[in-house]
């Protein structure tokens, strides 16, 4: 049986790279470690840039990601969206346009994208603005038929998430990244890869 080879290129900010995780895995490393199928060979490439908003991401993603794509394999794109536009005072209309441009380019290249939305912080007032950003990002993705994993809503009031941020200087630690990985794995990861859910079949 010929192996399927999927090349996953992931773009995003420092949370994608596992910043603050003592194990150095982050949520993406945990997700990849859990994705096992005897008929599948996965190749992953992490392209993280700290403190990056949607405009900078839109400017750099194609030049960096396209070097990892190959006509010989199935190419997939993970977009780990940050909350940075809130701090940069980017309007939601501009955030929407930046993400739409990324997804439209990916669609033109027949690349299926999975988006992971921004995670909540500890500041409730700031979280209100991140909630709106999350809503906008989700709308853009779903209108274009790409998978969107909402991490903000389930984690906003999650006691373990907030405790982990408090203990780790405002960034996730092992527990926080584990929660993010669980959400990704259980909210569309396997269907996006066209794989059976674990335990099926």
What residue spans do the PLM features occupy?
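Serine-esterase "nucleophile elbow" of acetyl-processing enzymes
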Residues: 1-50, 62-72
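Structural motif
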Residues: 7, 75-78, 112
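Cell-envelope and extracellular/periplasmic
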Residues: 15, 47-52, 79-86, 142
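Oxyanion-hole/transition-state-stabilizing segment in secreted/luminal serine hydrolases
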Residues: 21-24, 54-96, 121
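A general structural detector for well-ordered alpha-helical segments in enzyme core domains, enriched
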Residues: 27, 31, 64, 95-102, ...
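Glycine-rich phosphate-binding loop signature in dinucleotide/nucleotide-binding domains
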Residues: 67-74, 109-110, 191-193
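Active-site segments of SGNH/GDSL-like serine hydrolases
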Residues: 80-84, 102-134
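Catalytic His-Asp segment of secreted/periplasmic serine-dependent ester chemistry enzymes
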Residues: 120-201
């Amino acid at each position: 049986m010929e192996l399927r080879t999927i090349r996953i290129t992931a773009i995003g900010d420092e949370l994608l790279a596992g910043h603050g995780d003592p194990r150095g895995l982050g949520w993406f490393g945990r997700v990849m470690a859990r994705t096992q199928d005897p008929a599948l060979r996965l190749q992953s490439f992490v392209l993280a840039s700290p403190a990056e908003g949607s405009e900078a991401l839109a400017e750099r993603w194609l030049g960096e990601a396209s070097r990892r794509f190959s006509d010989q394999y199935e190419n997939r794109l993970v977009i780990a969206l940050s909350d940075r536009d809130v701090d940069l005072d980017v309007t939601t209309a501009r955030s929407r346009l930046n993400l739409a441009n990324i997804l439209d380019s990916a669609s033109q290249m027949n690349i299926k994208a999975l988006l992971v939305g921004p995670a909540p912080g500890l500041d409730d007032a700031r979280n209100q603005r991140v909630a709106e950003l999350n809503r906008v990002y989700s709308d853009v993705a779903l209108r274009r038929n790409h998978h969107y994993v909402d991490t903000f809503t389930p984690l906003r009031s999650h006691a373990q998430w907030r405790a982990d941020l408090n203990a780790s200087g405002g960034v996730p630690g092992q527990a926080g990244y584990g929660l993010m990985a669980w959400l990704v794995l259980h909210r569309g990861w396997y269907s996006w890869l066209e794989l059976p859910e674990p335990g099926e079949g």
